[in-house]
Amino acid sequence: PNIESRFFSSLAKNLEQRCRAEGYALFITNSDGLPENDLDLLALLVTRGVDGIFLVVADELADDSVLVDELSHLPVPYVMIDRVVDNLSCDKVLFDHEQGGYMATKYLLEKGHERIACMVNAAKSMTGRKRLAGYERALTEAGVAFDPSLVVETDYYISDAYEASANVLDTDATAVFASSDNIALGLLKRLYQ
């Protein structure tokens, strides 16, 4: 992932504090969300003799066979966080992204909105696709037809979301489900101008 993400920087901060409290130093590497960097960084950490690894892989690597092979032979314990390989037997910390998208959309529906735009990174992100699925499930459950013209594709960076949010303003949406904090910040920046 990219350490500039509010989610991942907060995760890193909390992991570092907990490790320090337990007498460990946390070394952080940043793949910039590029799958090719994850495997190199994993090898670097093992070479440096770390005691264990908290691993958050790039979205595109979650089902990568090379990654599965590398992790199957990793000589140190590891915990996968957020983005995991389903068929890999290891400790995992998961977030239910589909349920999160569902709950956010259901909240907006309960407030009386039916034309709800969804700003999401579904094209490049498994996490985004799961959040979009939750959005669609909430609409279907409420009897509201899914309208693909209300789905606005964006990356997880504030600047990208700011640019993409112009497309939201071109719709008749009365509410927006922004599928990440950075996407919400980009949207808010647009709305405040």
Predicted regions and their residues:
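Short beta->alpha connector loops
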Residues: D32-P35, A58-A62, N182
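N-terminal winged-helix
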Residues: P1-Q17
